[in-house]
Amino acid sequence: MTTRKPEELEGVTLLGNQGTNYLFDYAPQVLETFPNKHTNRDYFVKFNCPEFTSLCPQTGQPDFATVYISYIPNEIMVESKSLKLYLFSFRNHGDFHEDCMNIIMNDLIELMDPRYIEVWGKFTPRGGISIDPYTNYGKPGTKYEEMASYRMMNHDMYPETIDNR
């Protein structure tokens, strides 16, 4: 039994759709939302996306990452299948790691207007170097703006070792 009213699910068209169209080029328009039924409290929603792929803008070589997206929702939330398809749309998108993470965060801010959001990409090494861009945002003029500043200063306090990648 669902606690969602049909009108709350009107914008959710991809979930349960067997004819899913996988887009291979950057496509923010696939993102869908649904209402947050718990706006009276703060809570984190975290997505772990271990199969993110994009292309190096210079060489066209594939880059692979696990992307972590954590956010405190405001009025609306991102639907997970649409997020999966959106992230998949980076498959043929050529951009640097840092750009991809900021694009994802900017698109999700525009889509949801969250109280707080952070996006962290842990890319596999290429040329012997791994790059782990982290970006975050707190709604200006709120406690979440302070939270973003604090988390930025303290986000990665543990040096990388072979067993925590």
Swiss-Prot record:
Sequence positions that bind substrate: 78-80, 97-98
Superkingdom of origin: Bacteria
Biological process annotations from GO: queuosine biosynthetic process; tRNA modification
A GO cellular component annotation in the UniProt record: cytoplasm
InterPro entries: GTP-CH-I_C/QueF, NADPH_dep_7-cyano-7-deazaG_red, QueF, QueF_type1
Residue numbers annotated as active site: 56, 63
Any one Gene Ontology molecular-function term assigned to this protein's record: preQ1 synthase activity
Keyword set, alphabetical order: Cytoplasm, NADP, Oxidoreductase, Queuosine biosynthesis
Pathway: tRNA modification; tRNA-queuosine biosynthesis
Catalysed reactions, semicolon-separated: 7-aminomethyl-7-carbaguanine + 2 NADP(+) = 7-cyano-7-deazaguanine + 2 NADPH + 3 H(+)
The keyword Disulfide bond appears for this protein: no
Cited Pfam families: QueF
Broad EC category: oxidoreductase
NADP in keyword set: yes
EC number: 1.7.1.13
Localization: Cytoplasm
PANTHER family: NADPH-DEPENDENT 7-CYANO-7-DEAZAGUANINE REDUCTASE (PTHR34354:SF1)
Protein task: Catalyzes the NADPH-dependent reduction of 7-cyano-7-deazaguanine (preQ0) to 7-aminomethyl-7-deazaguanine (preQ1).
Family recorded in the similarity comment: Belongs to the GTP cyclohydrolase I family. QueF type 1 subfamily.
Entry protein name: NADPH-dependent 7-cyano-7-deazaguanine reductase
Organism: Bacillus pumilus (strain SAFR-032)
Top-level taxonomy: Bacteria, Bacillati, Bacillota, Bacilli, Bacillales
